[in-house]
């Protein structure tokens, strides 16, 4: 397999305006707005408070990360494959699907309907999942764009309106996604583009990613997945204990060594929203940064914005995630097989 090297000149190619991945990322705000404006089929009210809430399907863990701290009833994100025995007529089952939902998701959802559970289903109207869950107790949120995050935000807004979680304003979340698209646009020069700058900070290195809060941790895992796909490098999102162990095992650089002699990737520590951590996590971030500095490991930071500008947890999550996904997209563009770079 050819070793990949970074060619930063590719990041200034005017043809990037037509890059399919970048165009998809730029459309995140529009997809969130479309999902918000979709009229639900069926309706629930705040009076219909369930005994418990079960969420299955794509982005179930995102819904859990947002709702778990404030949901007034027991809440669970279920990995499948079977439906828990306790689910019944007093419970709410939320299903996040798409046109080709996994067979176990469809089966679980259909079983929940048979047991009389109240349902919220996000899926295309013509999908197998929508057909399998059609009932008098089902509220369908029709989706059209195939964007699990947009569907999840629409569901979170509905659950917030029902008093089952925090208030989520999709229009504000969409604005946050649009702002990232603007500053990370392929037409923005490298000197002012945080997506391109972050991509170069990650290039030819092994990213070790830490997000201290629940939602930042969720974003860190999604970003690590995107970097692995973009570069083939085993980027790792982990908790502070694991990263502590890895950083302590790093051998400090030999100032006299020839960097071209080793094929081993140097690590880079990526800290998410380090400037917005709750007080109990500030010391953890400082410790990781000191460990990295002690062994000459580069530190790069992804922020969801200035502290003085208030934003909801979901807005911050989307900002972090989109910045990381832009960086992964630019990293893929910049990486060139060695033979082509010569």
What is the role of each PLM region?
Residues 1-40, 117-125, 129-137, 143-144, ...:
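Phosphate-moiety recognition in structured ligand-binding domains
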Residues 25, 60-64, 105, 151, ...:
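Short, highly selective alpha-helical patches that border small-molecule cofactor pockets
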Residues 64-76, 224-236, 290-295:
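Short helix-loop-beta junction
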């Amino acid at each position: 397999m050819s070793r990949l090297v970074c060619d930063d000149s590719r990041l200034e190619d005017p043809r990037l305006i037509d890059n399919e991945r970048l165009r998809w990322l730029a459309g995140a705000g529009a997809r969130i707005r479309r999902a918000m404006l979709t009229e639900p089929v069926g309706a629930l009210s705040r009076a219909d408070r369930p005994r418990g809430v079960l969420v299955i399907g794509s982005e179930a863990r995102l819904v859990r990360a947002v709702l778990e701290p404030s949901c007034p009833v027991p809440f669970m994100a279920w990995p499948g494959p079977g439906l828990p025995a306790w689910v019944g007529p007093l419970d709410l089952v939320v299903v996040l699907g798409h046109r080709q939902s996994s067979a176990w998701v469809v089966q679980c959802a259909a079983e929940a309907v048979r047991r009389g559970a109240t349902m919220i289903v996000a899926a295309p109207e013509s999908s197998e999942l929508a057909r399998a869950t059609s009932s008098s107790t089902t509220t369908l949120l029709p989706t059209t764009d195939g964007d699990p995050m947009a569907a999840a935000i629409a569901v979170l807004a509905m659950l917030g309106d029902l008093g089952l979680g925090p208030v989520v304003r999709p229009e504000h979340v969409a604005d946050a996604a649009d702002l990232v698209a603007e500053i990370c646009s392929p037409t923005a020069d490298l000197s002012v583009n945080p997506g391109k700058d972050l991509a170069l900070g990650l290039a030819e290195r092994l990213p070790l990613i830490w997000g201290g809060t629940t939602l930042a941790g969720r974003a860190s895992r999604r970003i690590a997945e995107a970097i692995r796909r973009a570069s083939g490098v085993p980027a790792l999102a982990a908790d502070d204990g694991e990263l502590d162990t890895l950083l302590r095992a790093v051998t400090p650089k030999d100032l006299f060594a020839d960097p071209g002699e080793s094929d081993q990737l140097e690590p880079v520590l990526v800290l998410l929203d380090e400037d917005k951590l709750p007080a109990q996590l500030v010391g953890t971030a400082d410790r990781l940064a000191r460990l990295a500095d002690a062994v000459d490991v580069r530190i790069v930071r992804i922020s969801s914005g200035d502290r003085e500008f208030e934003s909801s947890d979901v807005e911050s999550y989307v900002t972090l995630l989109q910045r990381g996904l832009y960086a992964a997209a630019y990293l893929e563009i910049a990486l060139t097989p060695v033979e082509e770079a010569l």
